[in-house]
Amino acid sequence: MTIDINAIREALPHRYPMLLVDRVLEVSEDEITAIKNVTINEPFFNGHFPQYPVMPGVLIMEALAQTAGVLELSKPENKGKLVFYAGMDKVKFKKQVVPGDQLVMTAKFVKRRGTIAVVEAKAEVDGKLAASGTLTFAIGS
């Protein structure tokens, strides 16, 4: 099942320039794969870096967090709720992400306790790992 930008906008509160998920390619109960098409028109490229544009690593992690957020907030029991980013661990950046790249982002929920969830996430470009880490979320109203 795919999820288009309209359904993503319905699930997430983020809007331009902070909406970093363009389309969901696959979704199951605890795993999601989505894409972000990275273009030179992204506002962060104006300062990071003007002569050598590179997507900031923290925004790659934010895109992964939003990907996981789409999975959680698309569930009927979480409609109208928010997902709060509570932390990230074991983050590694392996490849620069530049204009023209397509980030393929995967998030898999590995642990849940009450309103807290832990996700293993990774972002790839052309099948090569760009970033990975463990993300922690709190689900609230």
Swiss-Prot record:
Q: Does the keyword Nucleotide-binding apply?
A: no
Q: Which UniProt keywords apply?
A: Cytoplasm, Lipid A biosynthesis, Lipid biosynthesis, Lipid metabolism, Lyase
Any one Gene Ontology cellular component term annotated for this protein: membrane
Where mainly found?
cytoplasm
Its domain of life? Bacteria
Which reactions appear under catalytic activity for this entry?
a (3R)-hydroxyacyl-[ACP] = a (2E)-enoyl-[ACP] + H2O
Q: What does this chain do? A: Involved in unsaturated fatty acids biosynthesis. Catalyzes the dehydration of short chain beta-hydroxyacyl-ACPs and long chain saturated and unsaturated beta-hydroxyacyl-ACPs.
> Into which family does the record put it?
Belongs to the thioester dehydratase family. FabZ subfamily.
What's the protein here called? 3-hydroxyacyl-[acyl-carrier-protein] dehydratase FabZ
Give the species this sequence originates from: Streptococcus thermophilus (strain ATCC BAA-250 / LMG 18311)
Q: Upper lineage ranks?
A: Bacteria, Bacillati, Bacillota, Bacilli, Lactobacillales
